[in-house]
A protein has these predicted regions:
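Polar low-complexity intrinsically disordered regions
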Residues: 1, 37, 201-205
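Basic helix-turn-helix/winged-helix DNA-binding cores
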Residues: 2-112
Length: 205
């Protein structure tokens, strides 16, 4: 692939290095009204937008999450730190999972660790997950680079030019998409298992 594509990839990988996320210490430990929640999420996750007009979180989204049992209802119209942490998880999950799947994934958290006074707080879970994700970033970048280099070895029988560039880029996109597809399938199988176990536990009650 040509220099422009290589430069684009390097630029993207540099962005990954500085990828912002909601740091555990930045989540306010006070109850917020809905307007304050949407403002907080917009400020914290603005850099993750693909387009400037993209919405991070709206009032309608929050109400729908509550309606679909992803998010416990607010107390006297106020949302706690635990609500905010769940909303961060939902924000990332919704890009790859259905609402029903997100409900299944978050159900154990909302049932066991959401209430105040629980032995293991949701904030502790969030911190642990953030730690894992930061540790994975370097290996993800290495994997993407290796995939790029492998894709650059395709269609070598073609002369250098637009056709070769387009097809090598297509091969790169396909390889990345296949990786996403396989990982998404694994996630869905795990979620199906969680759902099955949950149903069996309900039947025993």
């Amino acid at each position: 692939m040509n220099i422009d594509t290589s430069n684009l990839l390097n630029s993207i990988l540099e962005e990954l290095s500085s990828l912002s996320y909601v740091h555990p210490g930045d989540v306010p430990n006070i109850n917020l009204y809905m307007d304050q929640v949407t403002t907080f999420m917009d400020e914290q996750l603005a850099s993750t937008k693909r387009y400037p007009d993209d919405k991070i979180l709206t009032k309608t989204m929050i109400n729908n999450y509550t309606k679909n049992n992803l998010l416990p209802p607010p107390v006297k119209k106020k949302y706690s730190r635990e609500h905010l942490l769940l909303l961060v998880f939902i924000y990332y999950f919704k890009n790859i999972l259905s609402i029903k799947d997100i409900e299944t994934v978050l159900a154990p958290l909302t049932e066991k660790y959401f209430p105040d006074g629980s032995s293991f707080e949701l904030a502790d879970i969030y911190k642990e997950v953030c730690k894992i994700e930061k540790e994975q970033l370097d290996s993800i970048k290495e994997n993407v680079t290796a995939t790029y280099e492998k894709s650059a070895e395709t269609f070598t029988h073609l002369a250098d030019g637009e056709d070769k560039e387009i097809l090598q880029q297509f091969a790169f996109i396909c390889s990345l998409s296949f990786d996403v597809y396989i990982k998404k399938m694994i996630i869905e199988r795990i979620i199906d298992d969680l759902s099955s176990k949950s149903s069996k536990n309900e039947e025993k009650k």
